[in-house]
UniProtKB/Swiss-Prot annotation:
CDD domains: ASKHA_NBD_actin. The keyword Hydrolase applies. Keywords: ATP-binding, Cytoplasm, Cytoskeleton, Hydrolase, Nucleotide-binding. InterPro entries: Actin (IPR004000), Actin/actin-like_CS (IPR020902), Actin_CS (IPR004001), ATPase_NBD (IPR043129). It comes from Pisum sativum (Garden pea). Actins are highly conserved proteins that are involved in various types of cell motility and are ubiquitously expressed in all eukaryotic cells. Its main location: cytoplasm. It comes from the Eukaryota. Its EC number is 3.6.4.-. This is Actin-3.
């Protein structure tokens, strides 16, 4: 097995909030860490600490008190390439402990990623990291593969952006992809705001992490929002407690379902866009009438912001109300959907039929970064 391990492809899913990285063929990523780069706010405070000029991931998170944190990926798209390079370097050398020049690398990208961005990713892999081969795959397509399908519509909602991506026979249909700039980070912000109204203060990036954890542990999506609000007013059934790091205990009730309801009703935070259910429906309606039935019957949820209990039932209910009455609607919420993009990449990169799909270093040297548009689609 040691032989095979040497040339095992690496799979790196770069999300706005978290990086998921590991080896093709594994059933889960080996490394999951925050997509952040932190730089010291004040130089030379800690004498003799051998201070680095930048920290990445968990280390940046734990030293956040003395750092300025930056997220190089905004709304799913890389916006700061120097920091992105630091994240990849950290992924290969510190997290996976591999030499990137010895492994093919499969990277993921957001739907509708600008062409220049795909080229830049390709260039950095070959020129900075000297990878022998690489490939760029669309995140939602990998999630669909992970669910064992090649046709369906994926609602992929992470920390920084949500997309609805209709896929037919393995190919995303670009004209029908819709983007919703409402995702996990906005929900965390919303919960911070609700808690602030109640007299708690959460302002720093450290405190935001606490609220994110609270959201992940306690929030859920109600099947009937209005009815749930009524229930919450009269009974304590929805109340749960959460202990803060300092030992203080917070009780949250209606906030548990008010927070993620925003995904269905963005108007709650003053956004004029349609919710996740309507965006999914609109995406389907942009597709050819002949394939809609296949899409309605294969609505696949993916990404950390689809992890809320109750989301599949609510999506099913809302889309059923929008779709033709005779239409069979099926919403699939795979239990591993938090990592299904990565898992799909792991599956794809280990297929024998995929091996001719890689962009090889020689092809890159001959054609330059634009090779990515010819080989990855």
């Amino acid at each position: 097995m040691a032989e095979a391990e040497d040339i095992q492809p690496l799979v790196c899913d770069n999300g706005t909030g978290m990086v998921k990285a590991g080896f093709a063929g594994d059933d889960a990523p080996r490394a999951v860490f925050p997509s952040i780069v932190g730089r010291p706010r004040h130089t030379g405070v800690m004498v003799g600490m051998g201070q680095k000029d930048a920290y990445v991931g968990d280390e940046a998170q734990s030293k956040r008190g003395i750092l300025t944190l930056k997220y190089p990926i905004e709304h799913g798209i890389v916006s700061n390439w120097d920091d992105m390079e630091k994240i990849w370097h950290h992924t290969f050398y510190n997290e996976l402990r591999v030499a990137p020049e010895e492994h093919p690398v499969l990277l993921t990208e957001a739907p509708l990623n600008p062409k220049a961005n795909r080229e830049k990713m390709t260039q950095i892999m070959f020129e900075t990291f000297n990878t022998p081969a690489m490939y760029v795959a669309i995140q939602a397509v990998l999630s669909l593969y992970a669910s064992g399908r090649t046709t369906g519509i994926v609602l992929d909602s992470g920390d920084g952006v949500s997309h609805t991506v209709p896929i037919y026979e393995g190919y995303a249909l670009p004209h029908a992809i819709l983007r919703l700039d409402l995702a996990g980070r906005d929900l965390t912000d919303g919960l911070m705001k609700i808690l602030t109204e109640r007299g708690y203060t959460f302002t720093t990036s450290a405190e935001r992490e606490i609220v994110r954890d609270m959201k992940e542990k306690l929030a859920y999506i109600a099947l009937d929002y209005e009815q749930e609000l009524e229930t919450a007013k009269t009974s304590s059934a929805v109340e749960k407690t959460y202990e803060l790091p300092d030992g203080q205990v917070i009780t949250i009730g209606a906030e548990r379902f008010r927070c993620p309801e925003v995904t269905v009703q963005p108007s709650m935070i003053g956004m004029e866009s349609p919710g996740i259910h309507e965006t999914t429906f609109n995406s389907i309606m942009k597709c050819d009438v002949d394939i809609r039935k296949d899409l309605y019957g294969n609505i696949v949820l993916s990404g950390g912001s689809t992890m809320f209990p109750g989301i599949a039932d609510r999506m099913s209910k809302e889309i059923t109300a929008l779709a033709p009455s005779s239409m069979k609607i099926k919403v699939v919420a795979p239990p591993e959907r938090k990592y299904s993009v990565w898992i799909g990449g792991s599956i794809l990169a280990s297929l024998s039929t995929f091996q001719q799909m890689w962009i090889a270093k020689a092809e890159y040297d001959e054609s330059g970064p634009s090779i990515v548009h010819r080989k990855c689609f």
